[in-house]
């Protein structure tokens, strides 16, 4: 069916005056598992009835009190499908990612810095800048346009309006997606003072700039910041008020509550501007959920299919993405004005780069559990916009079991008891590359209808800004 036909079909729903969404369970929208035996006629159907009324009931144009934005880094349709096939089966569904009632697709190109023309394959920095500021920029830039001009982020605007703010990631907190909310630098590589002096000197404190990503993160002072990246906090400030002190010492002196494991995170009962929370759970990126062999040349033919195994480094001392999401919501929801929270499942992308299907799939399952927590809160609270999307598409493909692919492959045993082959073949280098196909965006709650149809990544900024009534 053409997109124009779908859009026309939705027009009566989108223009029906609705001021308040109904909150009872809507199984026709939320339960999308196959109805029965997939070998029987109708058994693979996911619809249990007409969804027109349920879609209408899900619409709301009232202001949102809270927004929870969940990003699957590198989570294109292929990554979602592969994870669903493996973990839930072909007829299964994700209770978070697949349960949001309103779905669309968005474009996500970057810009060439010199020409201003489209760069059809974005990186995470330009991508996150697009939804956090509403401005297209060049690959590698954070919080600035192609002319290197700063633009305020949705987190900065929410904080200025008195809302609580949160920034959660399984990556280093200096990595592109979390950094885009709090930093304005000409290169995403400027994690700490030393790298900033070398790679983006105009941003360095000694040159009158705003400092490194980590220094700007501390200045942004989100109420809750959770992730990896502890290593950079050991660097010493080379200029400014905190010159000679490590960034960790600076955080402590400025009143941050520092936690480093699941138990200490669990013990925190409040986080606000007087006592912001900074959780650093790894020197670099946080450990992934599942392990398995990387794809190799003709790996699906020369090697047996495998089942992914738990990562022993992801023990009980390491909070999961769902646990970090839960704690962030618990703490931020104490602000009567509301909150903005971004949650990133970062290593879908990183494991896709590494051609590691088990790593990639496990991180997608992790994100789904975080989405479930966000939806549970939103349905109970009644005034929260939940959005789930990605920053860019990626390299993995599902191919036939006997394919002699020119790239790297690995066979997996799925929940169905069948074999699924993952293929990675868009780079001869050690790292696979991003791709430029449009991405899924789905939402629940006030203003969720604005993700329907074809939008651009920058539209997400304006949708969130309008939903929260930010100026």
UniProtKB/Swiss-Prot annotation:
GO terms for biological process: protein dephosphorylation. Zn(2+) 2 binds at residues 73, 391-392. Keywords: Disulfide bond, Hydrolase, Magnesium, Metal-binding, Periplasm, Phosphoprotein, Signal, Zinc. Gene3D superfamilies: Alkaline Phosphatase, subunit A. Binds 1 Mg(2+) ion. Binds 2 Zn(2+) ions. Mg(2+) binds at residues 73, 175, 177, 344. It holds the Pfam family Alk_phosphatase. Its cofactor is Mg(2+); Zn(2+). Zn(2+) 1 binds at residues 349, 353, 434. One of its GO terms (cellular component) is outer membrane-bounded periplasmic space. SUPFAM superfamilies: Alkaline phosphatase-like. The keyword Phosphoprotein applies. It is found in: Periplasm. Residues 1-21 form the signal peptide. Disulfide bonds join 190-200, 308-358. It catalyses: a phosphate monoester + H2O = an alcohol + phosphate. Isozymes 1 and 3 are a dimer of identical chains, isozyme 2 is a dimer of heterogeneous chains, one of each of the subunits from isozymes 1 and 3. Belongs to the alkaline phosphatase family. PANTHER family: ALKALINE PHOSPHATASE. This is Alkaline phosphatase. It comes from Escherichia coli (strain K12).
């Amino acid at each position: 069916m053409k997109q124009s036909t779908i859009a026309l079909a939705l027009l009566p729903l989108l223009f029906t005056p609705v001021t308040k969404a109904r909150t009872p369970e809507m199984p026709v929208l939320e339960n999308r598992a196959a109805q029965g035996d997939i070998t029987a006629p109708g058994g693979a159907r996911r619809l249990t009835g007409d969804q027109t009324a349920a879609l209408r009931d899900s619409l709301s144009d009232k202001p949102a009190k809270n927004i929870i934005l969940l990003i699957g880094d590198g989570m294109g349709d292929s990554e979602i499908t592969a994870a669903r096939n493996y973990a839930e089966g072909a007829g299964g569904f994700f209770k978070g990612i697949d349960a949001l009632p309103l779905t669309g697709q968005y474009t996500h190109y970057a810009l060439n810095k010199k020409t201003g023309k489209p760069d059809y394959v974005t990186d995470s920095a330009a991508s996150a800048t697009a939804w956090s500021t509403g401005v297209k920029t060049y690959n590698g830039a954070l919080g600035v346009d192609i002319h290197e001009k700063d633009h305020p982020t949705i987190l900065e605007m929410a904080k200025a309006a008195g809302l609580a703010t949160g920034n959660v990631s399984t990556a280093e907190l200096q990595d592109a997606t979390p950094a885009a909310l709090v930093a304005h630098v000409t290169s995403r590589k400027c994690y700490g003072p030393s790298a900033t002096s070398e790679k983006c000197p105009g941003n360095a404190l000694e040159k009158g700039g705003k400092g490194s990503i980590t220094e700007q993160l501390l200045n942004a002072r989100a109420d809750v910041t959770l992730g990896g990246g502890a290593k950079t906090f050991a660097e010493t400030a080379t200029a400014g008020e905190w010159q000679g002190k490590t960034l960790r010492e600076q955080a402590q002196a400025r009143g941050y509550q520092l936690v480093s494991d699941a138990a200490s995170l669990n013990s925190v009962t409040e986080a606000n501007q007087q006592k912001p929370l900074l959780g650093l759970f790894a020197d670099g990126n946080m450990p992934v959920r599942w392990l398995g062999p990387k794809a190799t040349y003709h790996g699906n033919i020369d090697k047996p299919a495998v089942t992914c195994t738990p990562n022993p480094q992801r023990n009980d001392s390491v909070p999961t993405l769902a646990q970090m999401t839960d704690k962030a919501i618990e703490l931020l929801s104490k602000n009567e004005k509301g909150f903005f929270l971004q949650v990133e499942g970062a290593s879908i992308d990183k494991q896709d780069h590494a051609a590691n299907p088990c790593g990639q799939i496990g991180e997608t399952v992790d994100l789904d559990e975080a989405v479930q927590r966000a939806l549970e809160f939103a349905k109970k609270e009644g005034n929260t916009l939940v959005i789930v999307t990605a920053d860019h598409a990626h390299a993995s493909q599902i191919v036939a079991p006997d394919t002699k692919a020119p790239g790297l492959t690995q066979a997996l045993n799925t929940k169905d008891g069948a074999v699924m082959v993952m293929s990675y073949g868009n780079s001869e280098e050690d790292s696979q590359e991003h791709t430029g196909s449009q991405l899924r965006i789905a939402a629940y709650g006030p203003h969720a209808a604005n993700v329907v149809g074809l939008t651009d990544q920058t539209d997400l900024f304006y949708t969130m800004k309008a939903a929260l009534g930010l100026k």
